[in-house]
Curated annotation (Swiss-Prot):
Protein name, as recorded: Pyrimidine/purine nucleoside phosphorylase
UniProt enzyme class: transferase
Keywords: Glycosyltransferase, Transferase
Species this chain originates from: Vibrio atlanticus (strain LGP32) (Vibrio splendidus (strain Mel32))
Pfam families linked to this entry: Ppnp
Catalytic activity, as annotated: a purine D-ribonucleoside + phosphate = a purine nucleobase + alpha-D-ribose 1-phosphate; adenosine + phosphate = alpha-D-ribose 1-phosphate + adenine; cytidine + phosphate = cytosine + alpha-D-ribose 1-phosphate; guanosine + phosphate = alpha-D-ribose 1-phosphate + guanine
Leader peptide range in chain numbering: none
CDD domains xrefs: cupin_PpnP-like
Function: Catalyzes the phosphorolysis of diverse nucleosides, yielding D-ribose 1-phosphate and the respective free bases. Can use uridine, adenosine, guanosine, cytidine, thymidine, inosine and xanthosine as substrates. Also catalyzes the reverse reactions.
Family note: Belongs to the nucleoside phosphorylase PpnP family.
HAMAP family according to UniProt: Nucleos_phosphorylase_PpnP (MF_01537)
EC nos: 2.4.2.1, 2.4.2.2
InterPro entries (UniProt xref): Ppnp, RmlC-like_jellyroll, RmlC_Cupin_sf
GO CC term (a single one): cytosol
Length: 93
């Protein structure tokens, strides 16, 4: 089953699905700034564009480009700065 999700008044849209027992989502973020909370650990991969990320405990912002990934701890949060529309893959670990 595919589930459509909309966050931040339409600024972020994703399609969530399960593949071989693993929950996954793919989506697009419009330019803007966002804070996401996590329940489970996540691996985020930038598909097209760039995400500027600051996770809990990080001192500095880090830019991840197309093809690059970053992990986020469960029961945590992370801040994002998006300069232009960016596509991503989120794997729930």
């Amino acid at each position: 089953m595919i589930k459509e999700n909309t966050y931040f008044e339409g600024g972020v849209k994703s399609l969530a699905f399960n593949q071989s027992g693993a929950d996954v989502s793919v989506g697009v973020m419009a330019a803007g700034e966002y804070t996401f909370g996590t329940a489970a650990p996540e691996k985020m991969t930038v598909v097209k564009g760039a995400l500027i990320v600051k996770r809990v405990g990080d001192d500095d912002w880090t830019t991840f480009q197309s093809g690059e990934s970053f992990d986020v701890a469960g029961d945590s949060s992370f801040d994002l700065q998006v300069k232009e529309a960016t596509a991503y893959l989120c794997e729930y670990l």
